[in-house]
Amino acid sequence: MKRFMVSFARLSRVVFSVGVAALLGSLAVPAHAVTIDWVTVGDPGNAADTTTYGAVADAFQIMKYEWTNSRYVDFLNAVDASGTNPNSVYNTNMGSDVRGGISFTSGASPGSKYAAKTDMGDKPVNFVSWWDAARVANWLQNGQGSGSTETGAYTLNNNTSGNAPAVNVGALFYLPTENQWYKAAYYKGGSTSAGYWDYATQSDTAPTAVTAGTTGIGSAGSAGNFANYIDGADWNGQNGNVTTVGTNGGSSAYDTFDMSGSIWEWNDLTGAAGSTRGARGGYWSSFSAFSLSSSSNIAIDPSDESDVYGFRLASPVAVPEPATYAMALAGLACGGFSMWRRCKRA
């Protein structure tokens, strides 16, 4: 036992002095850390739909709402405090296009060069490629702040075009696979053989198009069979526009919002490397409800960017917020140090 305690003491000292210290350094929590509303998609091992999509072996989490302009501003100001736009994470159309939601001011102080445009902070970010979304996943994986955008969930190597890499084993944040996205949107839930809805509003009937007020809040609120499509949301002088997340009708069975209409959302297809990535859900100007339905999907170049593409991320079940896992590691460090001292005295 004495020999075991001495060995454990040595191990604890190594963990404390090297491993945990390094981990705590890499997971330093920024002052304005982004927090995310996650929902759990349970019923693991569910059957696929007749479309062949939707079967997922394990429970997972997915964002309740699409990634917004305000959250993307936090990302930009963290990873590009000086405004040099590494790896083209900022598309200038975000500022120049009326439907874009983010401005850039070169003369602003470092860390505040990007800002959400008036009434656009709570709208889904657009003009983002798959590469941009993957860099957000890496940013979260690395504890936010000024951490690397090139490693973590995905190994990107400063690429902005070409084949998209596979998601890395052990990723904590990632683009959902197509099956995960499909299940979160259309599965009825409650068992492994519950079946599927045609639309992500828990309905087999085409949604009614929402309208919008002068600040872009959807007319439907968070209930009912509605969606933002067929240019129904006319505001800010536009014939169809993005609207405030969560105000465009009812949720899916797993309590996700805006997975029918609003913005085409990137997905990772199978998660393997490839020359294309998927998108589902339709968008604010989809001329037919078919684009919003479970029968519609598209495969596109990962570098595509326009006012119709956005994203939401997924994660394994019970991934803590950055502050939580940083505190947990701090506890591990203190616990390891305490154990080492007790062992040393033994």
Name every feature range the model reports, one short phrase each.
Residues 15-26:
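Bacterial N-terminal signal peptides
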Residues 33-51, 164-166, 170-175:
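GGW-centered surface loops in extracellular recognition modules
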Residues 321-339:
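A short, hydrophobic C-terminal helix/tail in secreted or cell-surface proteins
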Residues 28-30:
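N-terminal signal peptide c-region/cleavage motif recognized by signal peptidases
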Residues 1-11, 345-346:
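N-terminal secretory signal peptides that target proteins for export/translocation
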Residues 54, 61-178, 184-210, 272:
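Active-site microenvironments of metalloenzymes and redox enzymes
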Residues 121, 163-168, 212-215, 221-260:
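Short, well-ordered junction/capping motifs at the entry into regular secondary structure
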Residues 33, 249-252, 272-319:
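Disulfide-stabilized, aromatic/cysteine-rich ligand-recognition loop
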